[in-house]
Amino acid sequence: SKADWRTFVVLGDGELQEGSNWEAIMFAGHKGLSNLTAIVDRNRLQQGARTEDTNRLDPLGDKWAAFGWEVCEIDGHDYNALYECLAGPRGDRPRVVIANSLKGKGVSFMEDRVEWHHKVPSAEQFDLAKAELGAAK
């Protein structure tokens, strides 16, 4: 019988540079693990580089679909879109939500900058970031 719970996996697109992830993706699709949902933070950045400078991941949704997954691609900053993907009717396959996002969104000096993947802000930068995020509300 099918499991009556759902399992969620959250991963970054940089992790998709690793073969073991694709082995697991292929296995889950082959076995029809319909209670499994993966959420990919597709910000196109990883430790030290842009993902596309390491290995080209696009067309990412087509790759997941080829391994038997339902694909839901959204604006990763749109919480309603995320909810719709997660709450939508379930099929007989695992589901992936590809959440296209912008690392550092809302903070001018952090947006889409590789170095902020691991960098710690100074006290001044932290205060500026808080102010910018507060102004965006």
Task: Put a short name on every predicted segment.
Residues S1-K137:
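Glycine-rich ThDP/TPP pyrophosphate-binding loop and its adjacent helix/strand module
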